[in-house]
């Protein structure tokens, strides 16, 4: 967490939080992502495996992106993308948490417009 804060203060525009090779638990992940709130630094989480619950957790905490390990086929890549997108183009669920609210956003209208855009492009 201290390293993340130092990177934010140094002006980093992105920080990669490595849960595949790093011993980072849920609480520390949340603290690391939260330390970027209100800054121009975007937290990207490298998940330990292609696990939908792990991906949703990171995104709900406010991760700006996900890096998936060991993606070797087009089908695996498609499955990874589906984990990050809301229905109807994906499997991500909606919950009004900090990552979705992003502090002050009107989450219902953002969600509805996201679904409308997804539906229009399907």
Locate each region found by the language model.
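Glycine-enriched alpha-helix->loop->beta-strand junction motifs that scaffold or abut catalytic
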Residues: 10-14, 60-65, 85-86
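Short, ordered loop/turn segments at secondary-structure junctions
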Residues: 19-22, 48-49, 71-73
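Alpha-helix-loop-beta-strand connector modules within alpha/beta enzyme cores
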Residues: 24-60, 82-89, 113-116
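Short beta-strand/turn micro-motifs at beta-sheet edges
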Residues: 2-4, 108-109
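Conserved anion-binding
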Residues: 53, 65-122
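Glycine-rich, proline-tolerant flexible connector loops at the mouths of alpha/beta enzymes
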Residues: 3-4, 8-31
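Hydrophobic faces of well-ordered beta-strands that scaffold small-molecule active sites
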Residues: 15-17, 43-47, 66-68, 120-122
């Amino acid at each position: 967490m201290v390293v993340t804060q130092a990177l934010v203060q140094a002006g980093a525009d992105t920080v990669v939080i490595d849960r595949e090779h790093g011993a980072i638990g849920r609480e520390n992940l949340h603290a690391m992502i939260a330390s970027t709130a209100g800054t121009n630094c975007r937290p990207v989480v490298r998940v330990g495996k292609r696990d939908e619950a792990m991906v949703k957790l990171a995104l709900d905490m406010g991760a700006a992106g996900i890096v998936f390990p060991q993606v070797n086929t087009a089908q695996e890549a498609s499955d990874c993308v589906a984990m990050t997108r809301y229905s109807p183009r994906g499997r991500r669920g909606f919950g009004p948490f900090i990552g979705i609210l992003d502090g002050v956003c009107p989450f219902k209208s953002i969600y509805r417009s996201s679904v409308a855009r997804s539906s229009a492009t399907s």
